[in-house]
């Protein structure tokens, strides 16, 4: 396994040594947080619901043909990576084309949780009044407060992350090519390559990967905190309670916060 940081290539002795050396990088911190979220959800139903809503939004915005709708195409690849049955994907596409289809909107909410930890909550909802009322209730019950738009958004970097397969490629040469596309973190792993870049580079990176013939495994938007806050065990528990409350809501797609990850 290789890890290539911009303008630098490091060949470690093992995967474990990579994790120890780079567990503070933006991308790796996001991966650890995502893994814990999946563990909390405990089953794939929540993941399928999330992807299904995103597919419906993409179809309404750009049509049901994945060859002409780049967002839909990447979501279908994400669904495959999560082992979402093909029938579920087809149903989501069909629902979006029906006359009485739910009109989902993507809305981001911002606020502060316990101990001044900043929260950014991404939702996909067909009823914003219901969603904002529920989210405000979760914040209030857990010792936090829902804020105004822009109140904490500046504390997070909006990034895109792609995972793709590129067998038989020189990682140093590939890294140099992708730097020109805006990539600032580059990982070569046993099952493929992961890259991170500013979200504005999403379309350019997806187009380039398609043109080069690389198999895209997944592509998504993420929010990564620019700074984090250390908390003791009791503080962490109170923040995790709010995270769990938010993630249990069917309208919530992603929850990001500025609490530091455990060592």
Predicted region positions:
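Short terminal hydrophobic/aromatic SLiMs and anchors at protein ends
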Residues: 9-18, 22
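Positively charged, low-complexity, intrinsically disordered RNA-binding extensions
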Residues: 161-263
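N-terminal cationic and glycine-rich segments that engage phosphates or anionic surfaces
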Residues: 22-147, 152-161, 257
